[in-house]
């Protein structure tokens, strides 16, 4: 059954668009598909649109302690040490997103924004029904946040122009997996902008 793009109240969830995504490097601690930075920068259009429509914007930031004590099993796969508290590249990408200290910010230690955070308390306080997801990685933090949102009975949408994965193949597979859970989950930026404008006060 396909629902409306926005059911009830929406929030834009900006996942892990952090300063390091916009630093040119030969090697990265986490693999990125081509055009990763460009896709992250495009999220600013969605952020501006949400603000103009009165839709709350919630930034998610992955951050780890410098002694690595909270990584758990996260380093057992393809990822190397990343997002340390004392690294400037871990900060939210202020210039590219327009983030301000007045914005909602959830810091997480795991892939899902729901796991071990007060994200759901914030969503309940805002009376949110629909999560509009952008950021990265499509196949990791976006996917797992989507799944936990789905299992918590939120309507979940992923803005496919504004997410990027560890590879093109992983990105596409994650988008298909999310669409499997909720028909109509994959949405273009243009579609989301139109829906947000329709919900403006």
What is each residue range found by the language model?
Residues 38-56:
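A short, N-terminal amphipathic alpha-helix
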Residues 15, 55-62:
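Short beta-strand segments at enzyme active-site cores
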Residues 16-18, 63-64, 88, 111-112:
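Short glycine-enriched loops at secondary-structure junctions
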Residues 65-75:
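Acidic, proline/glycine-rich short linear motifs
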Residues 27-36, 76-82:
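Short glycine-enriched, charge-decorated loop/helix-capping segments at active-site entrances
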Residues 11-21:
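Acidic-leg catalytic submotif of subtilisin-like serine proteases
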Residues 20-25, 67-69:
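Short acidic/His/Gly/Ser-rich catalytic and metal-binding motifs that mark active-site loops
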Residues 1-11, 48-53, 77-201:
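Active-site-adjacent betaalpha module
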């Amino acid at each position: 059954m396909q629902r409306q793009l926005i059911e009830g109240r929406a929030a834009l969830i900006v996942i892990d668009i952090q300063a390091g995504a916009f630093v040119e490097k030969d090697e990265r601690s986490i693999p990125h598909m081509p055009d990763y930075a460009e896709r992250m920068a495009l999220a600013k259009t969605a952020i501006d649109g949400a603000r103009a429509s009165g839709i709350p914007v919630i930034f998610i930031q992955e951050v780890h302690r410098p002694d690595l004590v909270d990584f758990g099993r996260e380093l057992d796969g393809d990822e190397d040490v990343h997002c340390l508290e004392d690294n400037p590249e871990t900060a939210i990408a202020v210039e590219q997103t327009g983030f301000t200290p007045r914005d909602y910010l959830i810091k997480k230690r795991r892939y899902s924004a729901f796991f071990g955070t007060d994200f759901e308390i914030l969503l309940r306080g805002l009376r949110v029904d629909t999560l509009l997801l952008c950021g990265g990685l499509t196949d990791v933090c976006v996917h797992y946040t989507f799944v936990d949102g789905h299992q918590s009975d939120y309507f979940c949408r992923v803005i496919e122009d504004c997410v990027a994965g560890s590879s093109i193949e992983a990105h596409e597979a994650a988008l298909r997996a999310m669409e499997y859970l909720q028909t109509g989950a994959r949405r273009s930026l243009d579609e989301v902008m139109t829906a947000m404008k329709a919900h403006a006060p």
